[in-house]
Amino acid sequence: MERYQDKVVLITGAGDVAEAAAKRLLCEGAKVAFSDFSQEALDAAISGLKAEGWDGERLMGIKCDVRKYEECEAAANAVLARWGQIDTLVATAGIIRHCPIDEMTEAQWQDVVDINLTGVFHAVKSVVPSMKERKYGHIVVISSI
């Protein structure tokens, strides 16, 4: 039996790191929900996994901007409505601005902070109540620079 058999994992982001995590979790038997502000990224991640043979019933995509707590809460609630639990949060959503620091605007910097830091806070805050209620849950935060 796989370690994540019938476990539900919510992954923030739908890029390469999120997809790699999803593949590993799917191999272990998990159901995986991606949340991302880009519908195109969600569609690409899910269609790519389906094309590789993964069961679409074990996949879910939710449009969600992690900068907004209400959207993270709605994403968590959508997962709970479909599968009844969230066992693990894997926070991978993040952005980088490719420009010299002395050319970066305050707005660009704030966007990085809002997604890479505040977004993690929002995602964690949105799943903790259901994890506390079940007295079970794992939170993994992945970042890179």
Question: Whereabouts are the PLM-identified features?
Answer:
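Canonical Rossmann dinucleotide-binding motif of NAD(H)/NADP(H)-dependent dehydrogenases/reductases
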Residues: 2-33
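Conserved glycine-rich Rossmann-like NAD(P)H-binding loop of the short-chain dehydrogenase/reductase
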Residues: 30-44
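The beta1-alpha1 cofactor-binding region of Rossmann-like NAD(H)/NADP(H)-dependent oxidoreductases
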Residues: 39-40, 63-74, 106
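Conserved NAD(P)H cofactor-binding loop of Rossmann-fold oxidoreductase domains
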Residues: 92-97
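Substrate-binding pocket helix/loop in short-chain dehydrogenase/reductase
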Residues: 100-101, 108-110
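A short, exposed helix-loop element centered on a Lys and neighboring polar residues
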Residues: 124-125
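Residue(s) in the substrate-gating loop at a strand-loop-helix junction
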Residues: 144
